[in-house]
Amino acid sequence: MAVGGFEMRIGNGYDFHRLVEGRRLILGGVEIPYRLGLLGHSDADLLTHAITDALLGAACLGDIGRHFPPGDPQWQDVSSLLLLSKVLELVRGRGLRLSNVDAVVVAERPKLAPHIPAIRQSLAGALGLPLDRLSVKATTNEGLGPVGEGLAMACHAVVLLEE
């Protein structure tokens, strides 16, 4: 869609991970103090994964699993911010510019509101975006399903790219 002479592309990303003992809880590159962490091949930062997938979708470049296969040892325990930076290079290489990000983390526990400012700062730096173009919110699942029972977390992200 062209608006004001710019072609715009919207991407949607989603991620879901189980919470387990013995792992750190990383969201947006920030470690959140909690007794459980997210299970995954990398650091399992589902917020960064959802944003990464949204970027790939908007650029029509596939999905995060295609670029960083979960069975590939080079991505074992890697920071998801590294994956995000590699995807940003691909997106920018196609002549696309990130305009804004809106994301919502769905988690019953821990309460994320106190950590949102640090998460936004971390992601703004990684994405090269001013804070007024990066929204991160948190909500619960009202006690329903695996997320509501505190067994998992989910994240939805939307990005807008401009050509």
From Swiss-Prot:
Cofactor comment text: Binds 1 divalent metal cation per subunit.
Pathway annotation: Isoprenoid biosynthesis; isopentenyl diphosphate biosynthesis via DXP pathway; isopentenyl diphosphate from 1-deoxy-D-xylulose 5-phosphate: step 4/6
Cystine connections: none
Signal peptide location: none
Segments traversing the membrane: none
Superkingdom: Bacteria
Protein's name in the database: 2-C-methyl-D-erythritol 2,4-cyclodiphosphate synthase
Gene name as annotated: ispF
